Design a protein with these regions (language model features):
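Short glycine/proline-enriched, acidic/aromatic patches that form the donor-sugar handling elements
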Residues: 37-39, 57-58, 75-76, 95-100
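Conserved catalytic-core segment of nucleotide-activated headgroup transferases in glycan assembly
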Residues: 1-63
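Conserved donor-binding/catalytic loop of nucleotide-activated donor transferases
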Residues: 62-64, 81-94, 102-103
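Acidic donor-binding loop of glycosyltransferase active sites
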Residues: 47, 53, 62-77, 87-88
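Conserved acidic donor-binding segment of nucleotide-sugar-dependent glycosyltransferases
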Residues: 103, 107-114, 122-127
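A short, well-ordered alpha-helix in the C-terminal region of glycosyltransferases
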Residues: 129-143, 150-156, 160
Length: 167
């Protein structure tokens, strides 16, 4: 998917060198089916891992210190999945579009390479902040995006739609 490839290439080119300047031991995982050749060629032993298809994405997500969503166009379910798993997330505002997140409370948002790298490094160095953001993100999902909440909202909309009109 082009937006994902663009995000990975931008992160690799613009953000990762800045992160490595502060945290040289950092590893970057690109997980997902059918990565284009340009993404596959980023792989470096011990530092950049391009997996291709994996049976269980959550297995990789559970092991991340920081989940990055460097999208510059598009959107998707990655953020909701990461928050549901209580992962600390750094995203562009585009990657978080349409989701009721608050910068510094349940996510860190950054729209340029320098700020994105600063947020990633901050989370890598601060396990308490990672835990707090992860827990707050999980609460956000439970409160606003769980199946129970979604079905309650849908039921309410149906009830309202079929309610007899009064004059």
């Amino acid at each position: 998917w082009l937006p994902n490839a663009d995000a990975v290439l931008w992160f690799h080119r613009e953000v990762l060198p800045l992160v490595r300047g502060e945290c040289p031991e950092v590893q970057f995982y690109v997980v997902g089916k059918n990565p284009p050749l340009a993404i596959q060629q980023l792989a470096e032993p011990e530092t950049i891992h391009v997996t291709g298809f994996v049976a269980d994405v959550e297995e990789y997500m559970a092991q991340t210190a920081v989940f990055v969503i460097p999208l510059r166009v598009g959107g998707g379910m990655k953020l909701l999945q990461a928050l549901a798993m209580a992962r600390a997330v750094v995203s562009t505002s585009i990657g978080a579009e349409g989701i009721a997140v608050t910068h510094g409370q349940d996510i860190l948002l950054a729209d340029n390479a320098t700020e994105f790298a600063r947020c990633v490094v901050q989370l890598l160095r601060d396990p308490e902040l990672r835990m707090r953001l992860g827990q707050n993100g999980r609460k956000l999902i439970e409160t606003f995006y769980s199946w129970e909440t979604a079905t309650d909202s849908l039921e309410s909309a149906y009830r309202h739609a079929i309610q007899p009109k009064t004059r």
